[in-house]
């Protein structure tokens, strides 16, 4: 994400010495206008300008569409409100709870949901939801956002996620709850032609232009690029962010090089346009207060107050600790690791690079079904393979699986795959990513998927080549 933003936002650098603006004279008319009551700061003025520009662009495009393409124009609108959709979420939650087994993990998840429900009517502002992997963060954050929106008559929920793998998973859950006609996916891997209903397909295509949908799931790049863009196509959607809830999932993945302008933008949107922001992750970054750098320009001016939804006494990290990391200081060769993996019928092996994954994959025996996962695969192939893995794990069918992703981006963090080590079938599933990140997901649904050898101690491995 950081590289993409650098390429797009820093393509034309502007030196401070090149700018000659008399701020008092330039904004004297604005200061004397009714807008002065909003106390817009100089640093935030460009967000107000861009928001007004968004209103103008969308109104102009819609009027033109009504004149030039009335059939498309008629397909817009007639959308459900969040108030209309809330009963569907309640029904889904109730059904989920009634069918859930009485386990420790499920009791903790219910506790988290109840806490989110209790705090949802709080005033608009910045909130954080810190829940370890497996604690039901996705549904709990959705419940909080929905009830918060209903309490404050807010327009829509926008969920921004760093990785398309998680977006596909989250959007699938949301469509299951609310129906595909109420959930908009907006990212590079989404193909509107996958929507079977023609009316819903056409509405989704049109909605990507201005985000006129009750629930939007998009990427961080799409969101923040639009907030700082000067292009009509990017800015057109911005006015529909006003009076909305912005859920930033896996917030620790925000690029540090752009953290200050991102935080400044969020503060501006909260103050001027009435949004609420929910930061969700298992490991919250420090986004509040003032962090002094080596010089004044390096100071980080964070958000003044972020309210954590889950109190410390819940001790969720202790209660949900499911994996004990035992660092193996002894280097292993690919052949040794492959031989160890081959001893078990169903194994998840996490390695660190694509090269490691390929070397290990080539050394695994062919006495089963081999499956390969990579972030280099095209989206259709990737989703097909993930679906096959889930089916094999669910049905207990023999499989010999290997998957890998970009080790530097952690593209599989937050992705849900459930299985267990002991099995009568031969299933070996290897994934290349951060061992520490992925080990947190190895018992997300009450089943063990271990990193090295099928034991209950995950051991990130070092290869000697």
Q: PLM features: residue spans?
A:
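Conserved Walker A/P-loop ATP-binding site and its immediately adjacent core
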Residues: 154-178, 187-190, 286, 354
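Conserved helicase motor
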Residues: 185-200, 352-356, 370-390, 404-410
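Interdomain hinge/linker at the junction between the two RecA-like core domains of SF2 helicases
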Residues: 283-343
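Accessory nucleic-acid engagement/destabilization modules that flank
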Residues: 1-91
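Inter-Walker segment of RecA-like/P-loop motor cores
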Residues: 179-228
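Walker A/P-loop
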Residues: 123-145
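Conserved segment of the helicase C-terminal RecA-like domain
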Residues: 1, 399, 430-465
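Conserved strand-helix element at the start of the C-terminal RecA-like helicase core
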Residues: 156-167, 340-365, 370-374
């Amino acid at each position: 994400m950081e590289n993409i933003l650098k390429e797009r936002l820093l393509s034309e650098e502007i030196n401070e010495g090149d700018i000659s603006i008399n701020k008092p004279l330039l904004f004297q008319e604005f200061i004397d206008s009714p807008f002065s009551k909003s106390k817009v700061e100089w640093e935030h003025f460009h967000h107000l300008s861009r928001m007004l520009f968004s209103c103008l662009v969308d109104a102009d495009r819609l009027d033109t569409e009504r004149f030039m393409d009335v059939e498309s124009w008629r397909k817009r609108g007639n959308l459900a409100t969040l108030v209309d959709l809330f009963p569907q979420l309640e029904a889904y939650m109730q059904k989920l709870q009634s069918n859930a087994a009485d386990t420790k993990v499920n009791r903790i998840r219910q506790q988290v949901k109840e806490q989110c429900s209790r705090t949802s009517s709080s005033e608009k502002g910045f909130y954080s939801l810190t829940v370890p992997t497996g604690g039901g963060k996705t549904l709990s954050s959705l419940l909080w956002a929905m009830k918060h929106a209903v309490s404050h008559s807010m327009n829509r929920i926008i969920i921004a996620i760093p990785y398309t793998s998680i977006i596909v998973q989250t959007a699938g859950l949301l469509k299951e709850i609310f129906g595909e006609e109420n959930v908009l996916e907006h990212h590079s891997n989404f193909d509107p032609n996958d929507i079977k209903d023609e009316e819903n397909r056409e509405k989704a295509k049109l909605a990507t232009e201005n985000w006129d949908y009750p629930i939007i799931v998009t990427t961080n790049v799409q969101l923040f690029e639009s907030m700082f863009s000067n292009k009509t196509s990017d800015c057109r959607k911005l006015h529909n962010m006003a009076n909305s809830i912005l859920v930033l999932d896996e917030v620790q993945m925000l690029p540090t090089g752009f953290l200050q302008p991102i935080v400044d933008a969020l503060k501006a949107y909260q103050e001027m346009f009435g949004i609420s922001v929910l930061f969700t992750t298992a490991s919250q970054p420090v986004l509040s207060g003032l962090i002094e750098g080596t010089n004044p320009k390096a100071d980080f001016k964070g958000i003044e107050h972020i309210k954590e939804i889950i109190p410390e006494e819940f001790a969720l990290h202790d209660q949900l600790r499911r994996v004990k990391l035992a660092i193996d200081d002894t280097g292993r060769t690919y052949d040794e690791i492959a031989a160890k993996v081959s001893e078990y019928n169903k194994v998840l092996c996490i390695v660190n690079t694509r090269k490691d994954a390929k070397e290990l994959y080539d050394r695994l025996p062919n006495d089963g079904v081999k499956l390969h996962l990579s972030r280099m695969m095209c989206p259709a192939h990737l989703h097909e393979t993930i679906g096959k893995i889930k089916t094999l794990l669910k049905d207990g069918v023999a499989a010999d699986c290997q998957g890998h992703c970009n080790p530097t981006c952690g593209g599989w963090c937050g992705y849900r795959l459930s299985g267990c080590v002991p099995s009568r079938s031969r299933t070996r599933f290897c994934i290349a990513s951060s061992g520490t990140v992925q080990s947190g997901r190895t018992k997300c649904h009450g089943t063990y998927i271990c990193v090295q050898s099928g034991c209950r101690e995950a051991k990130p491995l070092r290869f000697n080549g």
